[in-house]
Design a protein with these regions (language model features):
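N-terminal Rossmann-like NAD(P)+-binding domain of SDR-like oxidoreductases, especially those catalyzing
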Residues: 1-112, 132
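Short glycine-/acidic-enriched loop or helix-start segments at secondary-structure transitions
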Residues: 18-19, 59-61, 116, 150, ...
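Amphipathic alpha-helical segments in well-structured domains
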Residues: 34, 125-126
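C-terminal substrate-binding subdomain of Rossmann-fold SDR/epimerase-dehydratase oxidoreductases
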Residues: 36, 111, 132-241
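Conserved donor sugar-nucleotide recognition element shared by glycan-biosynthetic enzymes
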Residues: 81, 89, 121, 185, ...
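Acidic pyrophosphate-coordinating catalytic loop
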Residues: 117-118, 212
Length: 241
């Protein structure tokens, strides 16, 4: 009997402040990490899931984003260590599937939040909540009209589990796992202020380079292949958790 039957390759910093701190290590984590997990899967004949990202779509020109969209991403920018590392990992997974017959699963994860997030994580949900609870200024980068789709962690986990257990071995994905309800960053800030009762003011800072202007998953394929999967926890309810 195999020592390992299923592998979930989840390792990589996903917050821009972390992955840009050491971009070489970030790329190595995605690429070498994928090779290590694929080698283990081949040795054990195990099924292996790659936690990819909506960042492979870059600053998309197609909206919402479907899995067959190749993306609009800057391969030389500050974010590319993360984006290109994940794209390379997807390529490695498909190469192992074609060459060695390893049952691989690729999911592209959209913005996810939940309890126990690091207060210094640097991503927008944790930033806004921490700032609001401290009555510090809420920092919006750019005009606040850029959009994101926020997914509660429980919905993500359910989607990944279904990808591993409810799809045939010859179905590799990729599959978008995300909440298709879209909010502007300004809307998110006002929701956080309302839910926390904070007296924080909103301030605006320059938008970082290559920051996507819109992000929203098309989850048609997930609904079809993952047993009618769709997010069940909406933004306000998730933020209260």
């Amino acid at each position: 009997m195999a020592e390992v039957e299923e592998i979930y390759n989840l390792a990589c910093p996903a917050s821009p402040i972390y992955y840009q701190h050491d971009p070489i290590k970030t790329t190595q984590t995605s690429v070498i990490g994928a090779m290590n997990m694929l080698g283990m899967a081949r040795y054990n004949r195990a099924k292996v899931l790659q936690a990819s990202t909506s960042e492979v779509y870059g600053d998309p020109l197609v909206h919402p984003q479907t899995e067959d969209y190749w993306g609009h991403e800057n391969p030389l920018g500050l974010r590319s260590c993360y984006d290109e590392g994940k794209r390379c990992a997807e390529s490695l997974f498909m190469s192992y599937y074609r060459e060695h017959g390893i049952p691989v699963k690729i999911v592209r994860i959209f913005n996810t939040y939940g309890p126990k997030m690091d207060i210094n994580d640097g991503r927008v949900v944790s930033n806004f909540i921490v700032q609001a609870l401290r009555n510090e200024p809420i920092t919006i980068y750019g005009d606040g009209e850029q959009t994101r789709s926020f997914q509660y962690i429980d919905d993500l986990i359910e989607g990944m589990l279904r990808m591993m257990t409810a799809t045939p071995d010859d179905f590799t994905g990729p599959v978008n796992i995300g909440n298709p309800n879209e909010f502007t960053i300004s809307e998110l800030a006002h929701i956080v202020l309302e839910l926390t009762g904070s007296k924080s003011k909103i301030i605006r800072m320059p938008l970082p380079s290559d920051d996507p202007q819109q992000r929203k998953p098309d989850i048609t394929l997930a609904h079809k292949m993952l047993g009618d999967w769709e997010p069940t926890i909406q933004l306000r309810d998730g933020l209260l958790k």
